[in-house]
Amino acid sequence: MNLLNLFNPLQTAGMEEEFDAIKIGIASPETIRSWSYGEVKKPETINYRTFKPERDGLFCAKIFGPVKDYECLCGKYKRLKFKGVTCEKCGVEVTLSKVRRERMGHIELAAPVAHIWFLKSLPSRLGMVLNMTLRDIERVLYFEAFVVTDPGMTPLQRRQLLTEDDYYNKLDEYGDDFDAKMGAEGIRELLRTLDVAGEIEILRQELESTGSDTKIKKIAKRLKVLEAFHRSGMKLEWMIMDVLPVLPPDLRPLVPLDGGRFATSDLNDLYRRVINRNNRLKRLLELHAPDIIVRNEKRMLQEAVDSLLDNGRRGKAMTGANKRPLKSLADMIKGKGGRFRQNLLGKRVDYSGRSVITVGPYLRLHQCGLPKKMALELFKPFIFHKLEKQGLASTVKAAKKLVEQEVPEVWDILEEVIREHPIMLNRAPTLHRLGIQAFEPILIEGKAIQLHPLVCAAFNADFDGDQMAVHVPLSLEAQMEARTLMLASNNVLSPANGEPIIVPSQDIVLGLYYMTRDRINAKGEGSLFADVKEVHRAYHTKQVELGTKITVRLREWVKNEAGEFEPVVNRYETTVGRALLSEILPKGLPFEYVNKALKKKEISKLINASFRLCGLRDTVIFADHLMYTGFGFAAKGGISIAVDDMEIPKEKAALLAEANAEVKEIEDQYRQGLVTNGERYNKVVDIWGRAGDKIAKAMMDNLSKQKVIDRDGNEVDQESFNSIYMMADSGARGSAAQIKQLSGMRGLMAKPDGSIIETPITSNFREGLTVLQYFIATHGARKGLADTALKTANSGYLTRRLVDVTQDLVVVEDDCGTSDGFVMKAVVQGGDVIEALRDRILGRVTASDVVDPSSGETLVEAGTLLTEKLVDMIDQSGVDEVKVRTPITCKTRHGLCAHCYGRDLARGKLVNAGEAVGVIAAQSIGEPGTQLTMRTFHIGGAASRAAAASQVEAKSNGTARFSSQMRYVANNKGELVVIGRSCEVVIHDDIGRERERHKVPYGAILLVQDGMAIKAGQTLATWDPHTRPMITEHAGMVKFENMEEGVTVAKQTDDVTGLSALVVIDGKRRSSSASKLLRPTVKLLDENGVEICIPGTSTPVSMAFPVGAVITVREGQEIGKGDVLARIPQASSKTRDITGGLPRVAELFEARVPKDAGMLAEITGTVSFGKETKGKQRLIITDVDGVAYETLISKEKQILVHDGQVVNRGETIVDGAVDPHDILRLQGIEALARYIVQEVQEVYRLQGVKISDKHIEVIIRQMLRRVNIADAGETGFITGEQVERGDMMAANEKALEEGKEPARYENILLGITKASLSTDSFISAASFQETTRVLTEAAIMGKQDELRGLKENVIVGRLIPAGTGLTYHRSRHQQWQGVEQETAETQVTDE
């Protein structure tokens, strides 16, 4: 044993301790001294002539250990035989020099010093404990004031501050009856004399007696800190330091450069400063120097220690010779370049290389081409081993030589070594897990790595100079995992949405499309063939062409009852190309999948179907064959682009003239004052938008058809073989929007701020642009480039926050047994089913039985995983909604259960235990982030036009139903006018399933009745898109109030038109203060001149005009129900700025309160209005029991309810963006989840990105993981504190078992950054953001990190508790428990 120890001196008993948790705390002076190997007394570092460390200095060999292995400083003892001897001459212990990396020293401070983290890291912990303000504590610490530490019998207060003059006056007055101190001594005295237990008692009593919210918060915070100290057994005065530990010298090296200069770590400067000041202070104290000098020196010492610990936290940062702030201990660990992110979470690895990538079109899916040079270097150890084994080399040195000479045997051995040894390829940025995949290397000449074209989509790689890194898995386990889990051919489906990610693109698509298109009257049309071989012969002898329509007998394979394949022969009418393609179909895939022109979407469906029907292996082989075929026919097709392919439609000139005429007409109307400037702009933009679309349509119609003569000599249309059209139509490259710019018109352009320039570019690229048009276009083009550069960083940051909040979420058990879940319905918007029910529930587990609505029988039992078969069955039976399990309601404590998560999207079956679903969710949401531009102009263009819809039409036949919020009145023309704010017309089909849902704005005229049968294309409602009306619900005679011209309303005369109208003036703009509160209103009188009241109440009808309203009625005018009183131009009330794209997603996940948030009803009840205050309206809701809830709303806000309306809790009452916190509070978790999922999906859908809902739900689960204790009961929590949901549940269960009162709690929603920082693991939080704050808090709380999450385990250098690491962690825990039980048993037997 001792012999072994000789060679392994560092692995003594203490080093290899198994540990299960890491605890952080504040070190006591004794602890610091116990770490130390000696006191550093001098600021010297090394002797500049001998380069030997000075004795007692910062690099002293006596304290920190020898500079050279097994050699003392003076050279008396050398070599291993003297190991452990301490030299009597120089005092150095003979041992390994690497102890200089771990031996610490210490500095005995002549005066105590406060630790800056506990002082300045907000909120100040010292301030909290002492209940003093930070300002006061600083005045004491930096010697500006005295603090009374012991008032004795005097009337002074403990902790009272005295200025110097005060102090001397009081001394004269009271003599030695009281104690007051300055500096850290004073603070330390206060801390030492504070009775923690007593203080806690007092605070708990105060907490119960006090009523004010702010006070409760303040006391609770103090209580938390004091209880933490009490619990952990740390003393308060340890926050003040007597002893300063010194970092081991090799961690702050000093390296001699040539020319007698030294490169040194900043820490040495900072330590030197501390030692100098400390020694000076010692000397001054010995000399009994005057007080003022000593004080100054103590203050300087405090400042020196401050900047050593955290430079720049207080006052100016200390700078070195180069005027840069010195890098202190705190800077070493925080930020991107700090210890956590640079060295612990991101290490560089050996056995890796990188090179440019190029295409390997002949590779199989699981292969990649690896340059021989790289392979030789990467696989060196394996080659050395083989050379020695085969006896070609006797030592490693000899083997090295052989490899360097590159003798022929080495290449043979390399081939052997590489066979079946997977390597991993990675392309930065690795945005999701498919950014690293394993391949089998094929040795190639040249220096570029060859990559299979089909995996490019997963890596987001192209061959314009991208580079990739290669890593070699060394151990057998690593090779096994690479092969089974990471091999490219095992990753066919995308983890984000479960669709194939190995989908052909570009040339391959074009080749397959060209091959499967049909041509009218091609050579040999109508021939019949006995089998595909005959078709081959005919094609090769040029009897038929690729597109020739023929009839052929094909053999297909169908599964019989026993599950075996049987051949079936069918006749098909098809084309030559499709018949040839049928040869590569896997067994069991029907021919009809390829019996059509294959576009990109179709090919994706084809591969998906193949995966579901034929399994992984056949699909991979099929994908490879598709690729080879596609490339082959793309080459044979020779499709190219010429300028003539961009055909400009003949109708263009006429369409442009028509649009110009319309614009001219609008301009005329504007001159006559019929429309406002804003309306004119909206309409002009609208006209040009429509004109652009019409031209595009004419152009596409023109491009997509060509006239040909068929066999009978008639002229017929067939789909065009225009190259540009084929590329766009197949989905290979380009889109209709791009072709529109090539040969239609470029259309409207956006300014950099997103607003649209109203003069469009009428030319296209083929005609060429004028200088002005070119100039207009540069705006948008440059913004695009600037955006791209900026948005990448934002996207990366979002992904980082998401990963951090979900990193510890792992599937840990099979089933948590809950029956909770969410009800899923199809997403219907406008007339379209955006996401069908089947897509939303596929791969979920049912939470309750699914029942057939017509027969009432159970279709699917609760707890069943819904496969494709089952969802199709549910779909056909007409079920409208299904309750499914969801991660948000999962009851598993630390992690998730497989049933609540459902199907693992990338594997197509129930998720395995150990799958890191949190990280996968974060990557799936973050990865497309780069594609979500900051509010792109596509949206800029679309938003302006969507606003101009003026009617809704039904898209399908069915029955119209009005939503529950629908309110309308009939006007005197008999039209139904909508007066509700959130009304919808829903259309149900014959079985009663919801097919469409249309929003109808306030003031729209309904053209259908509730329950009426309607036909597709029927108009449901119409309205004026450019103004918002104000409508009366009662009939009567108009009587104005507060209608003073020039005070509340202004007669506006349009400069251009000379017509005038009354417009309500903004209250802020009015001259006198009295008139600011006046609001122009309209009352209604009956024929006797009495004010009309709201039916059933005695409140008179009174409608206030909002600011900017143009009043359309006159005093004394008779009006009927549903008449328009005023119109509010839409241009002035701009449509709310829609935050789009990435910022919107970030806003949702950060749970930010939107500015100008809308308001939701707090309770269910009846609305009434109370007395108005200055600038605010008072809205009162009274519930059934007569309890009133009132709230003040500023007058600018648009109130959506009116007197006497009944509202439900959580219904919107004031217009504005919804605050997610309100939804959670008033409508509960399910409504909140539905809102966030819906809103996030909206953003991704606009970009055409598909993400499974469950990923968003996983993030929401983490945002809801903490709860607020409303009433602690007898659980030991503090009322008002936030705790982990799991801890709270556990505490409540325990309380109930013991018959105590459980805690009541309320759900709270945390943004992802907040949630990451509030995790139980301080290591994970500290490595994310705000390192200083997290560590300070953790140290005071004496926190223990259980190392449950992935990040903590990466940091301490363990396998992560996910995937194959989960079993490792579980077996470790079992071993531990076994050991613990054994020790317990032995103790029992001993007794």
From Swiss-Prot:
The cross-references to Pfam families, in alphabetical order and at most eight, read: RNA_pol_Rpb1_1, RNA_pol_Rpb1_2, RNA_pol_Rpb1_3, RNA_pol_Rpb1_4, RNA_pol_Rpb1_5
GO MF annotation list: DNA binding; DNA-directed RNA polymerase activity; magnesium ion binding; zinc ion binding
Residues recorded as binding Zn(2+) 2, renumbered to this chain, are: C816, C890, C897, C900
UniProt cross-references to InterPro entries, sorted A to Z: DNA-dir_RpoC_beta_prime, DNA-dir_RpoC_beta_prime_bact, RNA_pol_asu, RNA_pol_N, RNA_pol_Rpb1_1, RNA_pol_Rpb1_3, RNA_pol_Rpb1_3_sf, RNA_pol_Rpb1_4
Task: Give yes or no: UniProt keyword RNA-binding.
Answer: no
**Class in the EC hierarchy, top level:** transferase
**Gene3D superfamilies for the chain:** 1.10.132.30, 1.10.150.390, 1.10.1790.20, 1.10.40.90, 2.40.40.20, 2.40.50.100, RNA polymerase II, clamp domain, RNA polymerase Rpb1, domain 3
Task: Tell me which residues bind Mg(2+).
Answer: D462, D464, D466
List the catalytic activities from the record.
Answer: RNA(n) + a ribonucleoside 5'-triphosphate = RNA(n+1) + diphosphate
State the Gene Ontology BP annotations. DNA-templated transcription
Q: What domain of life does the UniProt record list for this protein's source? A: Bacteria
Q: Could you tell me the keywords of this UniProt record? A: DNA-directed RNA polymerase, Magnesium, Metal-binding, Nucleotidyltransferase, Transcription, Transferase, Zinc
UniProt xrefs under SMART domains: RPOLA_N (SM00663)
Gene Ontology CC entries for this record:
DNA-directed RNA polymerase complex
Instruction: Give cofactor(s), names only.
Output: Mg(2+); Zn(2+)
Q: What is its EC number?
A: 2.7.7.6
Q: How many and how are cofactors bound here?
A: Binds 1 Mg(2+) ion per subunit.
Claim: Transcription is one of the keywords in the record: yes
Binding-site residues for Zn(2+) 1, renumbered to this chain = C72, C74, C87, C90
Subunit record text: The RNAP catalytic core consists of 2 alpha, 1 beta, 1 beta' and 1 omega subunit. When a sigma factor is associated with the core the holoenzyme is formed, which can initiate transcription.
**Which protein family is it in?**
Belongs to the RNA polymerase beta' chain family.
| UniProt cross-references to PANTHER family, sorted A to Z | DNA-DIRECTED RNA POLYMERASE (PTHR19376), DNA-DIRECTED RNA POLYMERASE SUBUNIT BETA (PTHR19376:SF54)
Cross-referenced HAMAP family:
RNApol_bact_RpoC
Its job: DNA-dependent RNA polymerase catalyzes the transcription of DNA into RNA using the four ribonucleoside triphosphates as substrates.
Q: What is this protein called?
A: DNA-directed RNA polymerase subunit beta'
Q: Which organism is it from?
A: Neisseria gonorrhoeae (strain NCCP11945)
